[in-house]
């Protein structure tokens, strides 16, 4: 599921080339997740990789709320024992604050997370020591209990 039509079309082409049966959906994540919750759909794995929600310091609180809300919805869609992976590419959001936001979202859903790892950019995505915001990619890997 992606809001970008071109990304969905490319994914469909790749799936067809590799002869994989995958359902690709062009939709807004918030709308689609709410629909899945209403329909009682649960998945073995949920991966959330939204666009940058915190664009500037003025939008920090609004961005945190979006991360919180999207992760609450995502957690409602993953079955107990399922894989839950969530990402942030907001440079102004620290890894600690990102993790705190995800844990808070899980608690509001009455869920616990068994956090397996908190990762970030790979070696092919370097950042300057004098510009910590360049280390903007954060990925939390967990089992949703």
Label each PLM-derived region with a short phrase.
Residues 26, 43-73:
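Mobile active-site "lid"/loop adjacent to the S-adenosyl-L-methionine
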Residues 37, 68-75, 103:
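A structural alpha-helix within SAM-dependent methyltransferase catalytic domains
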Residues 7-8, 32-33, 54-56, 92-95, ...:
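Flexible loop/turn segments at secondary-structure boundaries
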Residues 12, 37-38, 55-61, 98-99:
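Short amphipathic alpha-helical segments
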Residues 42, 69, 83-145:
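C-terminal catalytic and target-recognition region of SAM-dependent MTase-like enzymes
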Residues 78-80:
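Helix-to-beta-strand junctions that scaffold the AdoMet/dcAdoMet cofactor pocket
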Residues 1:
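The conserved SAM/SAH-binding core of class I Rossmann-like methyltransferase domains
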Residues 4-47:
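S-adenosyl-L-methionine
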């Amino acid at each position: 599921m992606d809001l970008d039509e071109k990304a969905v079309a490319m994914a469909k082409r790749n799936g067809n080339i590799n002869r994989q049966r995958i359902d690709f959906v062009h939709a807004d994540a918030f709308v689609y997740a709410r629909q899945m919750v209403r329909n009682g759909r649960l998945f073995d794995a949920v991966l959330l990789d939204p666009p940058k929600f915190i664009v500037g310091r003025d939008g920090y609180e609004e961005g945190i709320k979006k991360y919180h809300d999207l992760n609450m919805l995502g957690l409602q869609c993953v079955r107990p024992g399922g894989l839950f992976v969530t990402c942030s590419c907001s440079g102004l959001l620290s890894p600690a604050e990102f993790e705190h936001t995800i844990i808070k979202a899980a608690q509001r859903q009455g869920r616990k997370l068994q956090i397996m790892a908190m990762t970030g950019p790979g070696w092919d995505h370097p950042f300057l020591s004098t510009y910590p915001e360049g280390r903007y990619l954060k990925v939390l890997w967990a089992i949703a209990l």
